[in-house]
Structure formats: structure tokens, C-alpha cells
């Protein structure tokens, strides 16, 4: 029973970490990364589809992304989706190839992104601690109901704290790496 609760805690914390990592990956750094376009949805074929399902996206150089559209009829819809995404890319079209240019970032933009990164990181750490607290509350209720002993509660608490520390370390490491990437000109 305790192992199930510990596994639940670990799963919930890892899901939170996964969401955090995808949020951090979406923060633009001034360098071309194909993953920046992952969230773009295109209105085509009578519905909404992700950009990467109707084209291939590659990095040409540090400042340029190439979007090779598989069906030339979708170029207009893709251009509209990119403009509506407000990512600030400059672009040019050459047939079925859309060339996206990543604009240079000012120092103020970089500092604001670091602040945003710090807020996202702190929110994630708070979520992780809340998960830990919820799990510990469940364990205390179980101990009050005499389902587990006080020793089991203490041991489980130490193990859950260890999991919490590991996840928070990953958050801190990711924050520091992304901060360095953002501030590097």
C-alpha cells in the first residue's frame, strides 16, 4: 500500500516535471530550434493539424528554420498559422519551402525571459512540494487509522523527500542551463 502511494507521488511529480520541461523548451532563446514550432496548429484539410504533421521542419543555421511543406496547397495556411503564433519570425517563401528567420533578442528581452523562466521554475517547485504534502497527508491519515505504523510513516516520508529532492534538482539544473542559454549573446 505504501509502495503504491510512493509510486503515485513519483508519477505525479514526473508528470509535473515533464510539463515544466516542455514549457521551458518553448521559451525562445534567439537561436533557431525546430521545437519552437511544435505548438503551431494549421487550419487545413477541413480541420486543425499540427505543423509538423504536414511538413518537415529543420534548422538551417543558428538563425534560420526551414519548413518544407509536403503539399504546396498548404503554404498559405501555414504562413497564416506562423503569423498568428506571434513568435516574431521573419519569413520568405520559395515554392514549397518556407524560410523562417529568428530575430535577434535585446538584452531587456533576455532579462524578461529569465524572469519568466524563474517564475515558471518556482511554480513547478511549488507544485512538486504540494504533491509531497498531499502524499504525506494521505500517509498521516493512514497512520491515524492504524493502517501503517509510525516507523512506516517516517521511512515513507524520507523516501518521498528523496524523490522530491531529485525532481527539484532536475528543475534547478534545467533552470540554470536555460538561464545560461538565454543570457549568452
From Swiss-Prot:
Entry keyword annotation includes Methyltransferase: no
InterPro entries from the UniProt entry = Ribosome_recyc_fac (IPR002661), Ribosome_recyc_fac_dom (IPR023584), RRF_sf (IPR036191)
User: One biological process GO term for this chain?
Assistant: translational termination
Keyword field: Cytoplasm, Protein biosynthesis
Which GO CC terms are listed, alphabetically? cytoplasm
List the Gene Ontology MF annotations in alphabetical order: ribosomal large subunit binding
Q: Which Pfam families match?
A: RRF
Query: Where found?
Result: Cytoplasm
Domain of life of the source: Bacteria
- Family of this protein: Belongs to the RRF family.
So what does this one do?
Responsible for the release of ribosomes from messenger RNA at the termination of protein biosynthesis. May increase the efficiency of translation by recycling ribosomes from one round of translation to another.
Q: What is this protein called?
A: Ribosome-recycling factor
Q: Which species is this UniProt entry from?
A: Ehrlichia ruminantium (strain Gardel)
Lineage from the top down?
A: Bacteria, Pseudomonadati, Pseudomonadota, Alphaproteobacteria, Rickettsiales
**Gene it is expressed from:** frr
Amino acid at each position: 500500500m505504501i509502495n503504491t502511494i510512493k509510486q503515485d507521488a513519483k508519477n505525479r511529480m514526473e508528470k509535473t516535471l515533464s510539463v515544466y520541461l516542455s514549457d521551458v523548451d518553448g521559451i525562445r532563446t534567439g537561436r533557431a530550434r525546430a521545437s519552437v514550432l511544435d505548438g503551431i496548429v494549421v487550419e487545413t484539410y477541413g480541420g486543425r493539424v499540427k505543423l509538423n504533421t504536414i511538413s518537415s521542419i529543420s534548422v538551417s543555421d543558428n538563425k534560420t528554420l526551414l519548413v518544407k511543406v509536403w503539399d504546396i496547397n498548404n503554404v498559405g495556411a501555414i504562413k497564416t498559422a506562423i503569423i498568428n503564433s506571434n513568435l516574431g519570425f521573419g519569413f520568405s517563401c520559395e515554392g514549397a519551402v518556407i524560410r523562417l528567420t529568428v530575430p535577434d533578442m535585446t538584452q531587456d528581452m533576455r532579462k524578461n525571459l529569465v524572469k519568466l523562466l524563474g517564475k515558471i521554475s518556482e511554480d513547478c517547485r511549488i507544485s512538486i512540494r504540494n504533491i509531497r504534502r498531499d502524499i504525506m497527508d494521505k500517509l498521516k491519515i493512514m497512520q491515524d487509522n492504524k493502517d501503517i505504523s509510525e516507523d512506516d510513516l517516517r521511512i515513507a516520508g524520507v523516501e518521498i523527500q528523496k524523490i522530491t529532492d531529485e525532481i527539484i534538482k532536475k528543475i534547478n539544473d534545467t533552470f540554470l542551463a536555460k538561464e545560461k542559454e538565454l543570457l549568452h549573446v
